[in-house]
Regions:
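Short alpha-helix in the ABC ATPase nucleotide-binding domain helical subdomain
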Residues: 64-65, 109
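Conserved catalytic loops of ABC-family nucleotide-binding domains
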Residues: 98-109, 115
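Helical segment within the ABC ATPase nucleotide-binding domain
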Residues: 89-101
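A short, proline-enriched helix->beta-strand linker immediately N-terminal to the Walker B motif
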Residues: 69-73, 102
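C-terminal portion of ABC ATPase nucleotide-binding domains
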Residues: 37-38, 87, 94, 116-156
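Catalytic Walker B motif of ABC-type/P-loop ATPase nucleotide-binding domains
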Residues: 75-79
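ABC ATPase nucleotide-binding domain helical subdomain, centered on the C-loop/LSGGQ "ABC signature"
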Residues: 8-49, 102
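ABC-fold ATPase nucleotide-binding domain signature/coupling loops
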Residues: 33-62, 80, 84-87, 154-156
Length: 156
């Protein structure tokens, strides 16, 4: 969720004392730095309530950057990259892995690509756990996971 005010003000909800360098680093990890830099006013760009002047993917990336400014021990991403393309999703996941190695990340996603490198994956079907394991284990042992994987691979 974004609020009226500037991009910087929205990010500072995560840490009002964040330095410009910390804000830049969080934006880099969230793959938001480039699109912010391309805006005429950059971080000083005014957002309408809910960030109406940004795309869904841009809003999600700003929310991720704001969460990163809290320097969390646990980061929960609940379908937080659903509005970004797969290449952006991949860049963000890679940056999170490399820049926050000590942070526990809980990723809730519908895209297999978003979770396949996780230490372990919990598969839910109609609210019930049907499997827990690594990507390769679940492909081999879990019918629901395999069906989701096959349907997404065929789409691509």
């Amino acid at each position: 969720m974004l609020f009226s005010g500037t991009i910087e003000q929205n990010l500072r909800w995560g840490n009002e004392d964040a330095t410009p360098k910390q804000i830049e680093q969080a934006c880099q990890v969230a793959d938001a730095f480039n699109f912010i830099s391309e805006l005429p006013a950059g971080l000083k760009t005014e957002l309408g309530q809910g960030g109406v002047n940004l795309s869904g993917g841009q809003k999600q990336r700003l929310c991720i950057a704001r969460a990163l400014l809290k320097n969390p021990k646990i980061l929960i991403l609940d379908d937080s990259m659903s509005a970004v393309d797969t290449a952006t999703d991949s860049r963000i996941r890679s940056a999170l892995r490399n820049c926050l190695p000590q942070t526990t990340k809980i990723v809730i996603a519908q895209r297999i690509a978003s979770v396949q490198e996780a230490d372990f994956i919990v598969v839910l079907d109609e609210g019930k756990i049907t499997g827990i394991g690594t990507h390769s284990q679940l492909l081999q042992d879990n019918k629901v996971y395999k069906e989701i994987y096959d349907s997404q691979i065929r789409k691509n």
